[in-house]
Regions:
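Amphipathic alpha-helical segments
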Residues: 6-17, 81-93
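Oligomerization/assembly interface segments of phage tail-like spikes and tubes
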Residues: 59-72, 109-121
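Compositionally biased, intrinsically disordered low-complexity segments enriched in polar/Pro/Gly
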Residues: 1, 33, 59, 122-126
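Acidic-leaning, charged glycine-interspersed low-complexity segments
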Residues: 82-126
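Small/polar-rich, solvent-exposed N-terminal microdomains that initiate assembly or binding
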Residues: 1-52
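Charged low-complexity stretches with an acidic bias
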Residues: 69-83
Length: 126
């Protein structure tokens, strides 16, 4: 059976007590969420990429995800991203260059968006 890394990351974030009570979704922030409510959004930057080849076969996959935190409180964005970073490290993901760290006047929220790269174990089907 094929595995789904997005679901695995979502579950890891949802299971963390320090993130309880915060809306965590994939792909986009829910329209029904209040403008003043904090959210975390997991966005695949692309499909899994073949890596670690052997005998004309891909033995592992590389993944790239962007995780956005939006809040009316800049410090809360930083604290949440700090916790997310630890969770992602536990999942074998590390932050890459780029991202976003700014106040967006149109939505009246701070946004801290970071990109994480990780790899599956050998012989896992994703």
């Amino acid at each position: 059976m094929i595995k789904d890394k997005l679901t695995e990351l979502y579950k890891a974030l949802k299971e963390d007590e320090s993130l309880s009570g915060i809306s965590i979704k994939s792909f986009e922030r829910p329209d029904t969420l209040g403008d003043d409510e904090t959210s975390i959004v997991i966005i695949p930057v692309g499909p899994p990429i073949q890596t670690a080849h052997g005998s004309n076969t891909s033995l592992a996959k590389t993944f790239l995800y962007q995780i956005n935190v939006e809040s009316t409180n800049r410090v809360e964005c930083k604290e949440l991203q700090g916790r997310i970073e630890k969770i992602m490290e536990d999942q074998g993901f590390y932050q890459t260059e780029g991202g976003l760290d700014q106040w967006i006047p149109d939505i009246k929220r701070y946004v801290d968006a970071r990109t994480y790269k990780g790899r599956s174990a050998l012989y896992e089907e994703y």
